[in-house]
Amino acid sequence: MGLNLNPILRQELANLDKDTESRKSAMKALKSYVKDLDSKAIPGFLAQVFETKETNSLSGEYTISLYEILARVHGPNIVPQIDTIMSTIVKTLASSAGSFPLQQACSKVIPAIARYGIDPTTTEDKKRVIIHSLCKPLTDSLLASQESLTSGAALCLKALVDSDNWRFASDEMVNRVCQNVVVALDSNSNQTHLQMGLVMSLAKHNPLIVEAYARLLIHTGLRILGFGVSEGNSQKRLSAVQMLNFLMKCLDPRSIYSEVELIIKEMERCQSDQMAYVRGAAYEAMMTSKRIAAELESKMEKGCRSVTGSNFSRRNCSSIVPDYSLSPESQTLGSFSGYDSPVESSPISHTSCNSEFDRRSVNRKLWRRDENGGVVDISLKDGLFSRVTKGSTTVSDSPLVPYDTCENGDEFEGFLMESLRNTTPSPQRQRSRRINAEDFNIFSTPRKLISSLQYPDDVDLDHSDIQSPILRGEREKTIGSRKNPKLRKQFPTMVETMSSTITVSEDTAQTQMITGKKKKKKMSYAKLVIAISFVVVALFATVILMVNQDDDVGYYTVPT
């Protein structure tokens, strides 16, 4: 039956080049022939169509549409013939001379095969193979030198990407399509709008992969926009603006944030375009870019704000209020170099380390005044030893600095602290000294810490007796004698007596506190015993009363 229909098939294919009525009747007969075609006769049918088809004739798009009908009717049976069909489509696109109806007819065949050629029960690997067999010839055609083939392949790929089964394509294949379409956009062709349409489809369905090419695509779109202005091609300008707007909407704003300002400037220039639809598209893209810029700036500002109780803050966030006007409890120290903070340098004995660290925001610190007029920070949480003055300041870095990563490979020698305010050498004072952990007092209670801040020169004695005025006066005298060596030499006995008196009074106060606590515990125990005894007596009395009432009740005989 197939052999008898071959001459009829040739005749119907020839009628496609005739008038409209002949073409309609020929298409009706060919559709009927395709529906009744046996699956084994599909290869012969494809060969017959390819031999008799003239791609430069008006019947080219009608002939290609037979492949779409074949895919709809026979479904998975057409999968073995995908290579033959794709070869025919590529040759048709190459000889189409930029005919959009022919390119559109080819673009309908590809998603039809992807939809009807894949059986839902097929394994994932086979589905991926089918998508790759459709995609690979078109992807390679994007790099062709013929403009008609490149634009036609882009249109077919766009239809494939927009199909439901494109989700079975592997990331490697999607990445290859992105690479080739970026290269295709570099050539200033008259039909770059088709390649830009493919870019928008990829950004919609595969945004994570397209983000790797985001900046390159932005620059390419701006360059094409410039070509459209110089050439007077409004279609090219419109497509470029639409692609830029679509990329900003679909991709992560962080991947294109560096190019947002450039996009805003170009879109502002497009507001003077002659075409109203170009101005409208440019205005929409400008609003999108401004919204992205505002959102990212607000997020960055929120990230830069210091959070109460937080021990860290973001990099490159400078304080508006001068740091020297703040109290030591509210100052934020940049514990490492390279940040806007009271710290200007970090003079560790080896300064060749290239490590960068996050800025530290220390809210709760232990402070002790230094002999140079500065404030020494003793941080239990961060281990930072820092000196803050109102002038220029040098602060030693944290022991967290990995000195073993230095380039010279020398060992760490310790922390150096020097005040830049002392520019003249003095025999009584060293310009630099080595700081050790023993030089700092860590107080166990807040009361001792407050006392150390009020009496910074008396750090060796206990601060539990500061509340007593008598002991406070004696302490001040003792401190004065310590400060004045002459008084210490003249009255050594008095100083020792005061010290012993303070020690005895401290011991007496502590003993009285312990005795008072013991008395309170004994009183509480006595009260508890009395309460329990009272409850027991009350219960016992209640039971006795109930028993007596039972005894008083008698049994009397009824008189007869």
UniProtKB/Swiss-Prot annotation:
Residues 7-287 are annotated as: ARMADILLO-type fold. Pfam families: TOR1L1_N. InterPro entries: ARM-like, ARM-type_fold, TORTIFOLIA1/SINE1-2. The chain crosses the membrane at residues 528-548. Disruption phenotype: No visible phenotype. Affected nucleus positioning in guard cells. Residues 517-560 form the KASH domain. It is found in: Nucleus membrane. Interacts with SUN1 and SUN2. Binds to F-actin. Plays a role in nucleus positioning in guard cells. This is Protein SINE1.
